[in-house]
C-alpha cells in the first residue's frame, strides 16, 4: 500500500503543488499514517476468493471480454495499471517480446483529465523513451461522447431500472471531481462530464431526469 501511495501521490499531474514542500509532507506525514488506514479500507472490499482488488478483477475481465469479442489471433489485448502492478512499462516490454509493432493505448477514463488520461500518456512515453524498439503508437485520449459508449451507458441504466419495482425521482450521474484550480487552468474534464450526462439524457429511454454530481478528491487544492 505504501509503495502504491508513494507512486500515485508523487505524480506531478495528480498533485500540482511545490514538489519540494509536497515531498516533505508526503514522506513525513501521509506515508507514515495513510497506509494503515488505506489497508483497512481495502480489506473491506478485497475479493478474497480471487485474491485481488475489484479494480484488478474487473479490469482483467474487461480485457478478456474484449479479446474474445475481437477474436483475432494477430491482435493482442492486454491491460496495465497506471500505478502498481502490472505496470505499463512491464506490459509494453511483454508486447515487444510478442513481436507487436502497432500499439493502441486506451486509457479507461472516458472523460479526459490531466490527472488521469494525461498521466497514462506520460508513462507510456517514458517507457518507450527508454527502449530502442519503437512501435507505431496511437493513444485514444477520450470517448465521453462516442455513440457506442453512450449507448452502453444508457442500456446499463435502463436494465437496472427495469429490475426495480419503483420509479426513481432522479438519476444522478456521479463523477470524480478535480480541484477547481485545475479547471481554471484549462482542464476540460468538467465539461466532458456534463457532455456525457447531456448525451445520456438525450438518448436514454426514460422520462426520469438526470443530473450531474461530482465527488471531490481528497486534495490539498481547492
Descriptions of predicted regions:
Residues 147-169:
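Hydrophobic alpha-helical segments within soluble ligand-binding/sensing domains
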Residues 1-76:
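N-terminal glycine-rich anion-binding loop in soluble enzyme alpha/beta folds
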Residues 70-73, 128-134, 165, 203-207:
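Short helix-capping segments at alpha-helix termini
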Residues 180-212:
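Redox- and metal-dependent alpha/beta enzyme cores, enriched for Fe-S-associated oxidoreductases
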Residues 217-222:
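Conserved small/polar residues in nucleotide/adenosyl-binding loops
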Residues 164-189:
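An alpha-beta-alpha
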Residues 78-152:
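Long, hydrophobic, well-ordered secondary-structure blocks that form the structural core
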Residues 107-109, 139-142, 157, 173-177, ...:
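Short, structured patches in soluble enzyme cores that scaffold and shape functional sites
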Amino acid at each position: 500500500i505504501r509503495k502504491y501511495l508513494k507512486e500515485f501521490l508523487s505524480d506531478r499531474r495528480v498533485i500540482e503543488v511545490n514538489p519540494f514542500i509536497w515531498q516533505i509532507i508526503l514522506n513525513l506525514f501521509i506515508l507514515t499514517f495513510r497506509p494503515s488506514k488505506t489497508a483497512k479500507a481495502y480489506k473491506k472490499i478485497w475479493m478474497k476468493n480471487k485474491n485481488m482488488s475489484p479494480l484488478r478483477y474487473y479490469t482483467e475481465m474487461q480485457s478478456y471480454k474484449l479479446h474474445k469479442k475481437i477474436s483475432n489471433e494477430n491482435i493482442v489485448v492486454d491491460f496495465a495499471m497506471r500505478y502498481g502492478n502490472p505496470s505499463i512499462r512491464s506490459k509494453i516490454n511483454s508486447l515487444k517480446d510478442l513481436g507487436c509493432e502497432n500499439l493502441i493505448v486506451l486509457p479507461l477514463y472516458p472523460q479526459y483529465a490531466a490527472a488521469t488520461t494525461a498521466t497514462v500518456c506520460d508513462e507510456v512515453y517514458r517507457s518507450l523513451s527508454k527502449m530502442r524498439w519503437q512501435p507505431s503508437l496511437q493513444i485514444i485520449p477520450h470517448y465521453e461522447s462516442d455513440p457506442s459508449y453512450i449507448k452502453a451507458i444508457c442500456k446499463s441504466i435502463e436494465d437496472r431500472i427495469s429490475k426495480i419495482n419503483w420509479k426513481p425521482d432522479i438519476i444522478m450521474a456521479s463523477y470524480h471531481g478535480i480541484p477547481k484550480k485545475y479547471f481554471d487552468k484549462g482542464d476540460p474534464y468538467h465539461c466532458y462530464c456534463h457532455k456525457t450526462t447531456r448525451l445520456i439524457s438525450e438518448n436514454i429511454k426514460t422520462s426520469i431526469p438526470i443530473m450531474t454530481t461530482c465527488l471531490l478528491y481528497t486534495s490539498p487544492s481547492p
